[in-house]
């Protein structure tokens, strides 16, 4: 699977940035703090990226120290200055790129790679067990070959070739399955991300699959091959020495089953943790009502609108949307909720003395009147913005509960003032007229931030706005009417990222959902492989112990006794695997802490449920051979060779 950038269709001089995005923005060549340009350079031979970073960091830090002396930093708080000076330069291989998708999906993909590795180990252990069982059936054949002069090394090579052929065929089948699965995985990603996942065969992936197949075939085929050629010719030629004990392979085969059980339990525990984490995120109250809301973005500056024209366009747009019979209310917001973006700004709060280095940068959003009603965010105190606030004669703002608690404690913030900026002479001329309930901002995982809302027309430096429309019916059915209003006002104005707010919430959980689903699939697959491996060992053991079982039954052992004899061995193998896995899980799941939400890595319920699930699979795998053992005819068993 590879990434294909759909946005990079043309290359233009960076000096044309203003002409390509004519609206006001911080991402300009003149703004020294707006970092939006990536610098590409070719390193000298023998120079690693880490060495280049070590050389560039002192130069970068000197540039930062020079920048904080500029006039535009005069209003910045001490916290902003300190955070700015802590910035570091990043030197990355060009092949990795700087895509947002890679940044967001990096950690989840590493988790999935670890899970895939565990499944591969379980599958390899299973195949090794099957090879050993097959070698046991060929014990006399191998003994005859050795007896007539065949070299052991030649027999090992023959068995290794068989193992490699099996591994390569399995790798080829897996590659075909992966090609089909790629298309299924793409369905987890939103269709409007600026990259496209291609399922076309990649030579590097194919080479890795071939190398992994050959390597696993060698590593996990060598031990069975060596074990198969290490035979006692005298006993093997007489077909003796294994009828009761199960053969010299028994201990190694049981060890492989114990390993499979341990790894499967680790996967099931991980799957349980991810499922419960996703459930916690899905049941989280975002602070607003997601049902029946359509959200989209427009940028009138792309059609040549200026500042006053832009404000008029937005006023007319919201009025026309509210007039639609399908729409209950409509409003604007500068920052789209749950879009992984943010805008913060340094503030000075009236009557609050900031401590040295204290974070005075709440998240900021410019909104229109009715924004909170449209999103369903309750007003806890004071009032909403009105059309009269747009003029700017009286600067007003609304804060959330966390902002109010942080700077005003138990006192009411309504009627108090704050200002944007951190220098001692800043004017605190923005009056707080309301307090709204806390709501999420960037994504569901982050703690609720301190938030400041102002009328977008008072600080409208950005023509691109997000439009929210609460509908009276299914929002998907209202989208056509909403598009008609926008295109009726300006047929050439593009509409970006139109979707329902519920879909926006779902997209914010896209990687959590993908990891939880795939972890569950891998856990189920691992359990199936481990169960098959245990069944194979127990069936082989019952076949080898046919005479013993017949003798026990002839001496009076009941069917229940025979069933328990086999079941006990199966449960002991499971117990040994669980005894290894549970302490390991207690430590290894700590590595997943950053990927979990609302659940401890060592959650007892997840550990217990995973253990019970695997115990049930182990019991079922042991019961089938046990049931067959109980149906053995004692007379026929005593004649068994």
Spell out what each predicted region is.
Residues 1-107, 183, 270, 312-511, ...:
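Mid-to-C-terminal secondary-structure elements
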Residues 2-25, 68-73, 93-100, 151, ...:
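Short juxtamembrane loops and helix-capping segments at transmembrane helix boundaries
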Residues 90, 128, 164-233, 273-276, ...:
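Small-residue-rich transmembrane alpha-helices
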Residues 97-101, 130-157, 161, 181-305, ...:
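Alpha-helical transmembrane segments of integral membrane proteins
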Residues 104-140, 249-277, 512-547, 575-576, ...:
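Hydrophobic alpha-helical transmembrane segments of multi-pass inner-membrane transport and secretion
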Residues 123-170, 230-243, 532-573, 625-639:
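Intracellular coupling helices
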Residues 445, 481, 485, 489-582, ...:
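C-terminal transmembrane helical bundles of large multi-pass transporters
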């Amino acid at each position: 699977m590879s990434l294909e950038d759909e946005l990079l269709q043309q290359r233009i001089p960076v000096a044309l940035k203003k002409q390509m995005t004519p609206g006001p923005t911080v991402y300009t060549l003149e703004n020294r703090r707006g970092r939006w340009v990536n610098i590409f350079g070719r390193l000298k031979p023998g120079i690693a990226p880490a060495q280049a970073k070590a050389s560039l960091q002192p130069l970068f830090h000197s540039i930062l120290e020079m920048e904080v002396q500029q006039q535009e930093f005069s209003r910045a708080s001490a916290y902003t200055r300190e955070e700015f000076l802590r910035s570091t330069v990043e030197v990355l291989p060009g092949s990795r790129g700087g895509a947002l998708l890679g940044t967001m999906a990096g950690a989840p993909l590493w988790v999935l790679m670890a899970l895939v590795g565990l499944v591969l180990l379980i599958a390899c252990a299973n195949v090794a067990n099957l090879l050993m069982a097959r070698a046991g059936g060929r014990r006399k054949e191998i003994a005859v070959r050795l007896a007539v002069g065949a070299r052991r090394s030649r027999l090992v090579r023959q068995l290794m070739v068989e193992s490699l052929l099996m591994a390569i065929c399995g790798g080829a089948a897996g590659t075909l399955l992966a090609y089909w699965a790629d298309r299924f995985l793409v369905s987890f990603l939103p269709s409007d991300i600026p990259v496209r996942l291609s399922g076309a065969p990649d030579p590097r992936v194919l080479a890795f699959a071939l190398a992994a197949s050959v390597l696993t075939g060698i590593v996990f085929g060598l031990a069975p091959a060596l074990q198969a050629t290490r035979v006692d010719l005298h006993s093997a030629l007489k077909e003796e020495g294994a009828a009761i004990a199960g053969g010299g392979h028994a201990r190694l085969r049981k060890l492989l089953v114990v390993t499979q059980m341990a790894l499967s339990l680790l996967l099931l525990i991980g799957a349980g943790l991810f499922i419960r984490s996703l459930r916690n995120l899905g049941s989280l109250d975002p602070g607003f009502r997601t049902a029946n809301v359509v959200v989209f973005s427009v940028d009138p500056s792309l059609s040549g609108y200026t500042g006053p024209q832009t404000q008029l366009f937005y006023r007319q747009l919201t009025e026309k949307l509210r007039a639609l019979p399908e729409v209950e209310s409509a409003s604007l917001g500068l920052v789209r909720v749950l879009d992984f973006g943010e805008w913060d700004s340094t503030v000075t709060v009236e009557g609050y003395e900031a401590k040295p280095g204290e974070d005075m940068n709440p998240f900021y959003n410019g909104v229109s009147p009715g924004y909170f009603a449209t999103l369903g965010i309750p007003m806890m105190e004071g009032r909403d913005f009105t059309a009269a606030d747009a003029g700017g004669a009286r600067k007003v703002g609304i804060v959330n509960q966390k902002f109010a608690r942080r700077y005003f404690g138990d006192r009411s913030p309504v009627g108090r003032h704050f200002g944007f900026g951190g220098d001692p002479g800043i004017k605190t001329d923005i009056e707080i007229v309301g307090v709204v309930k806390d709501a999420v901002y960037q994504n569901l995982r982050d703690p609720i931030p301190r938030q400041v809302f102002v009328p977008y027309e008072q600080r409208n430096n950005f023509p691109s706005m997000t439009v929210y429309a609460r509908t009276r019916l299914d929002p998907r059915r209202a989208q056509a009417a909403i598009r008609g209003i926008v295109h009726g006002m300006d047929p050439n104005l593009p509409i970006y990222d139109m979707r329902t707010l519920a879909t926006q919430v779902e997209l914010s959980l896209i990687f959590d959902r993908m990891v939880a689903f795939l972890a569950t699939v891998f856990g189920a697959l691992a359990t199936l492989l481990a169960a098959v491996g245990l069944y194979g060992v127990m069936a082989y053991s019952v076949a080898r112990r046919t005479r013993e079982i017949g003798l026990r039954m002839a001496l009076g052992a009941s069917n229940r006794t025979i069933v328990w004899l086999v079941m006990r061995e199966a449960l002991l193998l499971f117990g040994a695997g669980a005894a290894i896995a549970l302490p390991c899980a207690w430590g290894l799941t700590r590595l997943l802490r950053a990927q979990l939400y609302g659940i401890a890595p060592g959650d007892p319920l997840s550990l217990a449920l995973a253990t019970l699930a695997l115990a049930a699979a182990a019991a079922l795998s042991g019961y089938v051979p046990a049931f067959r053992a109980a149906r053995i005819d004692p007379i026929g068993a005593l004649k068994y060779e």
